[in-house]
């Protein structure tokens, strides 16, 4: 028999070359194989495999926000982020050119939605109540459209590509609208 891996439904977690990108929480991934014997070959049905996550799903306290497109993974720990009059959009200066459009559109959308002015600055670290954006994430499983958002006293967004960082702004705006200007 020859067995060939065809693919998974979550390529962000299990690549075609079988590289595993550890998810945030345990995630069920469906995989398919091609089985060949001589001139005959068959495609298997989907097999579900659980890929262990970085965090236990039991630590999630805050519910996953409902946004479109849906968040692929979520761990909601205790506490929340609240915007303030001092909130800023902080762009990693190494990616100033790549994130220029994001900064411009997020600023306009944020001001239209909240009625609050927000400044765009370039720095390597955010302050309290800031939105921080950077590229060059080491998590290659994020692919072009993925992002990792960490919420604490600031909101930090890491992406591999500017498209993923832009999608993060859309999720942020939807969550702020639903939760009276806070992010769980």
Predicted regions mapped to residue ranges:
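Acidic, contiguous N-terminal accessory segments
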Residues: 52-184
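Beta-rich interaction/scaffold domains
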Residues: 1-59
